[in-house]
């Protein structure tokens, strides 16, 4: 029970952080482009916690399965004023409309009640209508202005503040920023690990020793420089490993340098069978170093390596070399995260960085409802010279989202069978 709880907490913290930075990428680029962002949400479903800062409501929702940035023009519930509709207008000192009250008008003693004749809240920013039943007036709507519905304020978004109004480049960068934020996060985490823990180097030096390994028993110490093994000169850590692995159970003569003096040590590798192959092991780890430039280089190497590995895995999945039941969903990832967390904070950080790369790559796939799907429609727009009809695009994304949810259910059921049944 305790282990299950720890797995759940580890998963929520790690996955929540990945989603946070992914959505933060979208948010920052959207705001930079001048898009009105109504909500920044981590999770789906009912709100657990929320606060508003400037134009945006920041929320944490119940189900930690993703997140979203709700941008103006992408709202499912757009408010429109219709002819004959009776609304209340709250005016500022200059006579411009600050708030359009749709109900509970009695809450406002200084309200101007208007029967709407015409309203343009995207371009012209005005409302015309009749006051006192017969007097026709035109009211200018200021920026920012708000609808008030059930005593809740909703900011009115002129067209120039909407997602669709922005250039193709601005929209592309806003969508691309999410996956890019995941790659950047992974790079930063790998660099931090290098700065705190160190990074492996391919030098002929003994690293940390295991308590009961053959190396410690023979008298080797951390920091010993290996000059030669059985008379063969060693230039790298890789050469040392290959030599030890190739001689299970056979005494090896190590020529080492310690404190400026050379000495000879005999070590007999323990024979161990791994995946059907018998290899030699002496219980030593690769040497580690710490430096800013080295950590940055290692971070770039790790980010590239895991990006390549994940892309290769996806290619094998598409070509049928991997089966669907080999995929892991939220349950499988949560279980794996819990196991990794038991190994220590650095292992958990590295696991989180790998998951972040995974999230970035998956979101770049040209599938409906994913960032890659949006980017595909932008590419079509660039070729055609005009955007795809919004309703048609929305339907494609809706169907794609439904299929993704179906896939999620299948993968989750596989996880439950694998780990709990």
From Swiss-Prot:
The keyword Transmembrane applies. Zn(2+) binds at residues 22, 26. One of its GO terms (biological process) is proteolysis. Keywords: Cell membrane, Hydrolase, Membrane, Metal-binding, Metalloprotease, Protease, Transmembrane, Transmembrane helix, Zinc. GO terms for cellular component: plasma membrane. Its EC number is 3.4.24.-. It is found in: Cell membrane. The active site is at 23. Gene3D superfamilies: 2.30.42.10. It is a multi-pass membrane protein. Its cofactor is Zn(2+). It is an enzyme of class 3 (hydrolase). One of its GO terms (molecular function) is metal ion binding. InterPro entries: PDZ, PDZ_sf, Pept_M50_Zn, Peptidase_M50. Residues 186-271 form the PDZ domain. The keyword Transferase does not apply. The chain crosses the membrane at residues 8-28, 175-195, 345-365, 393-413. It comes from the Bacteria. Belongs to the peptidase M50B family. Is responsible for Site-2 cleavage of the RsiW anti-sigma factor. This results, after a third proteolytic step catalyzed by the ClpXP protease, in the release of SigW and the transcription activation of the genes under the control of the sigma-W factor. This is Zinc metalloprotease RasP.
């Amino acid at each position: 029970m305790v282990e299950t709880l720890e797995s759940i907490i580890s998963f929520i913290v790690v996955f929540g952080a990945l989603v946070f930075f992914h959505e933060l990428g979208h948010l920052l680029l959207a705001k930079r482009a001048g898009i009105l962002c109504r909500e920044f949400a981590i999770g789906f479903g009912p709100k657990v916690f929320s606060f508003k800062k400037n134009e945006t409501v920041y929320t944490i929702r119940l189900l930690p399965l993703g997140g979203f940035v709700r941008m103006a023009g992408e709202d499912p519930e757009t408010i429109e004023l219709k002819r004959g509709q009776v609304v209340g207008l709250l005016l500022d000192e200059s006579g411009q409309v600050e708030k359009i009250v749709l109900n509970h008008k009695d809450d406002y003693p200084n309200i101007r009640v208007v029967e709407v004749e015409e309203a343009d809240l995207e371009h012209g920013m005005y409302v015309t209508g009749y006051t006192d039943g017969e007097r026709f007036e035109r009211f200018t709507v200021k920026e920012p202005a708000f609808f008030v519905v059930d005593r809740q304020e909703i900011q009115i978004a002129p067209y120039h503040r909407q997602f669709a109004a922005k250039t193709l480049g601005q929209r592309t960068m806003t969508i691309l920023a999410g996956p890019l934020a995941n790659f950047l996060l992974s790079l930063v985490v790998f660099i931090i690990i290098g700065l705190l823990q160190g990074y492996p180097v391919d030098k002929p030096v003994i690293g940390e020793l295991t308590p009961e390994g053959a190396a410690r028993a023979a008298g080797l110490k951390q920091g010993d420089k290996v000059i030669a093994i059985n008379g063969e000169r060693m230039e790298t850590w890789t050469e040392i490993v290959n030599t030890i692995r190739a001689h299970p159970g056979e005494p090896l003569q190590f020529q080492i340098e310690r404190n400026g003096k050379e000495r000879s040590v005999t070590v007999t590798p323990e024979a161990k069978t791994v995946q059907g192959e018998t290899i030699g092991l002496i219980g030593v780890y690769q040497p580690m170093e710490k430096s800013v430039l080295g950590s940055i280089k290692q971070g770039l190497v790790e980010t590239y390596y895991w990006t390549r590995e994940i892309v290769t895995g996806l290619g094998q999945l598409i070509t049928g070399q991997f089966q669907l039941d080999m995929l892991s969903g939220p349950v499988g990832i949560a279980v794996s995260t819990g196991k990794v967390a038991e190994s220590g904070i650095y292992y958990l950080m590295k696991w989180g960085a790998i998951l972040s790369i995974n999230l970035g790559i998956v979101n770049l796939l040209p599938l409906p409802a994913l960032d890659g799907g949006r980017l595909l429609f932008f590419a079509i727009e660039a070729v055609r010279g005009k955007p795809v009809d919004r309703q048609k695009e929305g339907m494609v994304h809706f169907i794609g989202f439904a299929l993704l949810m179906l896939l999620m259910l299948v993968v989750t059921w596989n996880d439950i069978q694998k780990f709990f049944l």
